[in-house]
Structure formats: C-alpha cells, structure tokens
Amino acid sequence: MTNIRKTHPLLKIINSSFVDLPAPSSLSSWWNFGSLLGVCLAVQILTGLFLAMHYTSDTATAFNSVTHICRDVNYGWLLRYLHANGASMFFICLYLHVGRGLYYGSYTYSETWNVGILLLFTVMATAFMGYVLPWGQMSFWGATVITNLLSAIPYIGTELVQWIWGGFSVDKATLTRFFAFHFLFPFLVAALVMVHLLFLHETGSNNPTGIPSDPDMIPFHPYYTIKDILGFLIMLTVLSALVLFSPDLLGDPDNYTPANPLNTPPHIKPEWYFLFAYAILRSIPNKLGGVLALVLSILVLAIVPALHLSKQRSMMFRPLSQCLFWFLVAILFTLTWIGGQPVEYPYIIIGQMASALYFLTLLVFMPLTSLVENYLLKW
C-alpha cells in the first residue's frame, strides 16, 4: 500500500517540501538560518497574537496597556520580552541568511533572491511599525522622523506624509493604523515565505561549493530535520537567556518614558537592527539624497546577481573575494556603531566613508575582484 504522505493531496505537498525533498549532502550550518527564520516568524505571530489581546491602540492608553501587560497579565512580561527580543533574533538570522546567500552565490537563483529582498523590506516595515506601538518617547519620535522622510519625495511628499499620519502630526490615527498594519504584515510575510520556498524548490538548494550536486542528493528527513532541530534548540536557548537575564539589553531606555510631543529626546535612533541603514541615511546632507541612499542600501542587493562576473558561483575557492566579503561585514558593523552615535565630528566623516565604501564594495570592488580571479585562474 502506498504511504498516505505520498498520496494525500495536502500531505504530499508537505512531504515533497520537508520530508522527501532531495537536498545536497554538503550543506553546512549556514543553511540552518532559513528554518530558524521560520521559527522566529512563528514565535512572533504567536506572542504578538496574545499581546494584541491586551493591547489598546489609543494614544491615551497604549503606554499604560503595555505596562498592564507586564505587571498584571499572567506571564505578560514573558510575552512582551519574547516578542521584543524575538524581533532581534529575527534580524540576526535574517542578516546571517542574506550574508550566506552573498558568500555562496545563492543570489544566482534570481527569483528566490528577489522574493527574499521583498521579504526583507516587509519584515523591516513590520518591525518599524511594531516599535511605534508601545508609545514611548523613542516610539513617537522615531515614527515622526522616519515617516517625515517621505516629505522629501518631490511634489507629493507633504500630502503623502499627512495621508500616512492621518492628520498634521503623528497621533491617534497614526497609532491605530500602524497597529492594524503591524498585525496584518506578518501574515503577508508568511505568504511571501511560501512563494520564496516555491521558487527555491523549483531549482533545489545551492551548496557551499557552488557546484551542481544533482548526483549526490540525500532526503531532507531525517538528515536535515535533525540538524534544524539542533539549530532551533541553540537559538531558543540564546533567546531565552536574553529574555530571562537581560530583556532590556537591546532596547532604548527612552522608550520607558511616555511619548511627549513637546519634549524631543537628545538622540533619536531606531532599534539596533536598523542602525546601519540609519547611518547611511544620515551620511548624506541632502534630505532626498539620504532617503534614496536608505532605500538603495537594501535595494542594492537586487543588482548583485547582475554584477556576478566570476566563473565560479561560490566564494569558497576565491580568497580575494572572501577578503572583500569580510571587509563588507566590517563596514556594516562600523555603520551600525555610527548609527547609534551623535551627529558630530569624527562620527560624521566615519559614517560618510563607511557608507561610500559599502556601496563601492558591492558595486565596484567585488565585480572587479571577480575579473582578477578569473584572469589569475586563466579562465
């Protein structure tokens, strides 16, 4: 008799995606982050759902409702900090996942890569709107500063900002719509994840060597399911340690002060995972130029496949490109640090240099290095 998982209309989809899926035998732990992102998304949706049951999206009560969740709701403090720090884990896994794609040339699967970029934008938008909901000082002023950037768009900018705000400033209407979208977007992310996986399973996974692995495939279960479960345990251990020992480590103390439109905090900055983009935004003295640089800091990933000039797919056997890749990582750490510093000398010039090097590395140095490596290998 044929196994039900191979014949049932619904189960056979799951079977072909997670059980009998042929996978390269050489996948390293860097291939764990896709499944870890799935776990992060599930944790965020579940904790978010329970938080939404107690949260009120009104400027008069939003801050107090978050306090009420932490003090009066059974394990409300755990839900709130799992959700806040779960977002940090989400972005750590996201950036490592993108980094893996860049290093091993996974971007040559252009459909999967482009859906991934769309996912990155959607997750960033979701996280930004979520940061506004506790209605602390940094929530209010972060929302004001970031939404106000849209006013740099010629001709329609001012009207667009007022349309998003639902008035002439960030207020009750803004908070209500941000809550609505923050609740909706994770389900949009889940739908895009399905599309992402659909495109990935059309081509099959890449592997560390970048060489086609069709003759050497193994079933996803049990080999990679066990490997993924180990990844889940490690990530959930780190998340639990963060939540239970220092839940406010990655947060901003200003967000424990209720939002006050009459009092601007000395340093307005987003959550740590947006600091690199914020540093790129601030490094350009022109408002419209800054907004374009901010968008391009992520959108630049879309033209990486077109700039792949190497005859080899992966960087595994390309030491010069490896050096450049880790140089890029160092630049991103520098930008993250600069994004959290005040706008004064020497931070301004460091930020401008790091921003220029970020774009130059991706758009100029990496393609040129690929050509040099091709020449050295006489290809």
From Swiss-Prot:
List keywords of the entry alphabetically.
Electron transport, Heme, Iron, Membrane, Metal-binding, Mitochondrion, Mitochondrion inner membrane, Respiratory chain, Transmembrane, Transmembrane helix, Transport, Ubiquinone
UniProt keyword annotation of RNA-binding present: no
Question: What InterPro entries does the record tag this protein with?
Answer: Cyt_b/b6_C, Cyt_b/b6_C_sf, Cyt_b/b6_N, Cytb/b6-like_sf, Cytochrome_b, Cytochrome_b_C_euk/bac, Cytochrome_b_N_euk/bac, Di-haem_cyt_TM
Q: Where along the chain is heme b b562 bound?
A: 83, 182
Q: List the record's Gene Ontology CC terms alphabetically.
A: mitochondrial inner membrane; respiratory chain complex III
- What membrane topology was assigned to this protein in its record? Multi-pass membrane protein
| Assembly, per entry | The cytochrome bc1 complex contains 11 subunits: 3 respiratory subunits (MT-CYB, CYC1 and UQCRFS1), 2 core proteins (UQCRC1 and UQCRC2) and 6 low-molecular weight proteins (UQCRH/QCR6, UQCRB/QCR7, UQCRQ/QCR8, UQCR10/QCR9, UQCR11/QCR10 and a cleavage product of UQCRFS1). This cytochrome bc1 complex then forms a dimer.
Q: Which GO terms describe its biological process?
A: mitochondrial electron transport, ubiquinol to cytochrome c
Task: Give GO terms: molecular function aspect only.
Answer: metal ion binding; ubiquinol-cytochrome-c reductase activity
Entry function: Component of the ubiquinol-cytochrome c reductase complex (complex III or cytochrome b-c1 complex) that is part of the mitochondrial respiratory chain. The b-c1 complex mediates electron transfer from ubiquinol to cytochrome c. Contributes to the generation of a proton gradient across the mitochondrial membrane that is then used for ATP synthesis.
Organism's domain of life? Eukaryota
Membrane-spanning regions, if any?
A: 33-53, 77-98, 113-133, 178-198, 226-246, 288-308, 320-340, 347-367
Summarize where a ubiquinone binds, as residue positions: 201
Q: Which cofactors, by name?
A: heme b
Q: Which PANTHER family match?
A: CYTOCHROME B
**What protein am I looking at?**
Cytochrome b
Which cellular compartments is it found in?
Mitochondrion inner membrane
Q: SUPFAM superfamilies from the xrefs?
A: a domain/subunit of cytochrome bc1 complex (Ubiquinol-cytochrome c reductase), Transmembrane di-heme cytochromes
Additional record remark: Heme 1 (or BL or b562) is low-potential and absorbs at about 562 nm, and heme 2 (or BH or b566) is high-potential and absorbs at about 566 nm.
User: Which family does the UniProt entry place this protein in?
Assistant: Belongs to the cytochrome b family.
CDD domains with a match to the protein in the record: cytochrome_b_C, Cytochrome_b_N
Q: Which Pfam families does the UniProt entry name for this protein?
A: Cytochrom_B_C (PF00032), Cytochrome_B (PF00033)
Quick one: which residues bind heme b b566? 97, 196
Cofactor details (free text): Binds 2 heme b groups non-covalently.
